[in-house]
Design a protein with these regions (language model features):
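Donor nucleotide-sugar binding/catalytic pocket of nucleotide-sugar-dependent glycosyltransferases
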Residues: 122-179
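A short, well-ordered alpha-helix in the C-terminal region of glycosyltransferases
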Residues: 182, 323, 330, 337-351, ...
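Acidic donor-binding loop of glycosyltransferase active sites
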Residues: 266-280, 293
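Conserved donor-binding/catalytic core segment of Leloir-type glycosyltransferases
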Residues: 161, 176-204, 210-213, 226
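Conserved acidic donor-binding segment of nucleotide-sugar-dependent glycosyltransferases
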Residues: 309-321, 330-336
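Nucleotide-activated donor-binding/catalytic signature segment of Leloir-type glycosyltransferases, i.e.
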Residues: 238-256
Length: 371
């Protein structure tokens, strides 16, 4: 299995290790190889990228020669850089008896409509040479189907989401919130904590969140916004917060390791995540589901497949700070609605445990192995 580097950022590093652990518990022999192209926060030189891809392909080839593996599972993304890596890897591996299954952690549908002939050829090459494609939402499956990909190759799959606050009582959740407030120096117990956690790129919607916070502040609403993450848009976001005079309301934490984010999910009041990125299964949303955290987000891909308003979330339009501010106000003013969201989200989270998700993949693997 091609795995993310354990030091990398994003969803795969959170969901794939517990998935592999469950496969092994079920008796499946799994060999892991790091399968990355470059870094998230810093640019990796082209030469280093090429060397890394070639070395990874050689390791895969050796493993497939030395043992009779049935499936090669690659964790990837349907974007230009990842497809370049995938094409090189697949070409260097052929021929192989193992069936190749690629799980796309997000997909850029614009690649199907590109005018660049070399990109169209790259897309056709990869999609023609894999045996199965894992997509994280029904929308993505429909995009691939409309682009002419054979339906029998397409599978809608889930990410594993580690258990959150399902065994915590309401009192324990309040205690978590109080501990987080104490750590942050927020004295007032009634001050709500809004959470934004993501890689800082414009499409994640942080600009809209900050504009919405300025509206809330001007309306006299007390709150704190906790911004966890790093990336290319961080400097612009910090400058925007300063320009809007939000120093008292907004705190930037920078990158927080996955293992240290739990207290923010369980201690915050609402996740505010108006993303319009092409991610398939936003782990921030589903980690919030697992923590029983009320959610305000956009109706995007896997979120649209599994979440329902008002049971699990409130929907907001992308690039609409006024609407976002109104939804935040609505949810903050409805204590019972937040409590109901917590219950419903904890129930929904059971669908994404490793013990539920791993057997679903085994069915796909068995189907591919028989073809």
């Amino acid at each position: 299995m091609g795995m993310p580097d354990r030091e990398s950022l994003g969803g795969p590093v959170a969901c794939e290790p517990p998935f592999v652990a469950e496969l092994r518990r079920l008796g499946v022999e799994v060999a892991e190889e790091t399968y990355v192209y470059g870094g998230k926060l810093s640019r990796t030189p082209l030469r280093q990228r090429v060397v890394r891809v070639l070395a990874t392909a050689r390791r895969f080839s050796r493993l497939l020669r030395e043992a009779e593996f049935d499936i090669l599972h690659l964790n990837s993304s349907f974007d230009t850089m990842a497809l370049l890596r995938d094409a090189a890897t697949i070409q260097l591996l052929r021929p192989t008896r193992a069936r190749i299954f690629v799980k796309f952690h997000g997909s850029d549908a614009a690649l199907f409509e590109t005018n660049r002939a070399e990109l169209r050829s790259l897309v056709r090459f990869v999609l023609a040479r894999v045996d199965g494609i894992g997509l994280l939402s029904a929308e993505e499956r429909e995009n691939f189907r409309r682009a002419g990909v054979e339906g029998q190759k397409l599978f809608v799959v889930k990410n594993v989401v580690s258990a959150g606050a399902d065994e915590k009582s309401a009192l324990q959740v309040q205690q978590s919130a109080n501990l987080l407030r104490a750590k942050l120096g927020v004295d007032a117990e009634e001050t709500p904590l809004l959470l934004f956690i993501a890689r800082f790129i414009p499409a994640k919607g942080l600009t809209d969140v900050l504009d919405a916070c300025a509206i809330l502040r001007d309306e006299g609403r007390a709150f704190r916004l906790l911004c966890l993450g790093d990336g290319a848009a961080r400097a612009a976001a910090e400058a925007q917060a300063a320009r809007l005079q939000l120093a008292e309301q907004v705190r930037f934490f920078g990158y927080v390791p996955e293992a240290e984010t739990g207290e923010f999910y369980t201690g915050s009041t609402i996740l505010v995540f108006p993303t319009y990125h092409y991610e398939g299964f936003p782990m921030v949303i589903f980690k919030s589901v697992a923590a029983g955290l009320p959610i305000i987000t956009t109706r995007i891909r896997a979120a649209a497949d599994y979440l329902r308003e008002p049971d699990h979330c409130l929907w907001v339009e992308p690039r609409n700070p006024q609407m976002l501010a109104e939804k935040i106000t609505q949810l903050l003013d409805q204590t019972e609605a937040r409590a109901a969201m917590r219950r419903h989200n904890l129930e929904l989270a059971r669908q994404f445990t490793a013990r539920v998700v791993a057997p679903e993949y085994l069915e796909i693997y068995n189907q591919l192995a028989k073809t």
